[in-house]
Amino acid sequence: MSILNVEHLTHGFGDRAIFSDVSFRLLKGEHIGLVGANGEGKSTFMNIVTGKLMPDEGKVEWSKNVHAGYLDQHAVLEKGMTIGGVLKSAFDPLLQKEQRMNEICDQLGDADPEQMEQLMEELGTIQDELTLHDFYTIDAKVEEVARALGLLDLGLERDVTDLSGGQRTKVLLAKLLLEKPDILLLDEPTNYLDEEHIAWLKRYLLDYENAFILISHDIPFLNEVVNIIYHMENQELNRDVGDYEHFQEVYAVKKAQLEAAYRRQQQEISELKDFVARNKARVSTRNMAMSRQKKLDKMDVIELAAEKPKPEFHFRYGKTPGKFLFETHDLVTGYDEPLSKPLNLSMERGQKIALVGTNGIGKTTLLKSILGLIPSLSGTCELGENLEIGYFEQEVKGENRTTCIEEIWQEFPSFTQYEVRSALAKCGLTTKHIESQVRVLSGGEQAKVRLCKLINRDTNILLLDEPTNHLDVDAKDSLKKALQEYRGSILLICHEPEFYQDVVNEVWDMSKWTTKVF
């Protein structure tokens, strides 16, 4: 049974076409992976099917009485809301019924016999509905999911605006799972999640009986949980039955077949044109030449899509720093309360270190304390000599209305326009992306613009806070290669072992230093 039908969908932003005349269907129980490079339109597609965005052309049709739950990579939480309040809001329809039930109870004292009968009938109906939907176990359900995603230890009364990006993602995900929709729409749910909770989500989705559509660049995760792949590329959307690994094999074969057919056809076209040119003027061969020309005119010419630029990251190494890059002396990090025990850490030239641990444990706080961006609660951090620091921040707040070109030019005013465009193109951005405002780009494209700033300046130590979030497969591969080849030192926060294990030579586990209990 089809839950969702999308027919002849066309959409773009200005003169930038996203997809053209695409169709899509979602059947009951299908676990779909929606894949494609950054900027191909995956999140745009999700916004269209959820009604957040109207398409230029086409039809989106949901089955009747289908409840779809959407985890948006750009969703926000309002100040003043608590973790527990957000999670309980998953049950708002039931809570409203409870409120109506309480109103009825208040009205019973003043009701005449006829009103009493009507109110009692309504009261019974509401009580049956609440019992059917396990209303009286709401608190237990909230606690169960909060514990599974590590939210219980943060405190259900905590304001959501005090949370890190990863913690906010967990809150939104927990709320969505508590709603138990007929279909889950998940846009990069593993971004910011640590290994333990990615594993929990993987188990949850494997056991999930209903349908879901999942956008993710986490290939091991995709391979485990999906059974259908929809691939978005060159304004097209193509379906393949199987996991991502199977899709890659089929995609490579189809691409090779198309390229071979293109070469054969180009050879044939060349030979036909040559024959026509040599024989159209001669009376004896004119008819044969006209026949060949007709064949040319009727030929359905194969066109190969223009190759998208693949990112080629390369970090420039500056001057050689001193032996010690930084040393901490009884450093205690945190904001109102300590997040760490007194830390005595040191990093030497040549070290490449992964900083790991659960969300909210203080990894970003430690990085910012080392850089002096936030004050420590006590203790000191002493930076070494001749440091040229490159810092990639996990979250950049606020809307950036500058274009990509302006963004890079502000950072490197001596660059010519050609050099700016070339620098952005090397990061995998097309001309259309380069001329767009940063705020309209996908999360992955925005990350590439920020990486462009980093790779074009001399550094001898990189401090990177979750640089793989939002990046597509090609960009991740290129970034990993660039970090492996980088001659400087690296302190890297990353939740993907398959990324950092081949880059670093040491792992620092924050769980050994935290004051928090998880």
Question: What spans do the regions from the language model cover?
Answer:
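ABC ATP-binding cassette signature C-motif
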Residues: 1-260, 309, 318-518
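Post-kinase regulatory C-tail/linker adjacent to protein kinase catalytic domains
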Residues: 313-315
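Intracellular alpha-helical coupling/juxtamembrane segments of multi-pass membrane proteins
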Residues: 250-305
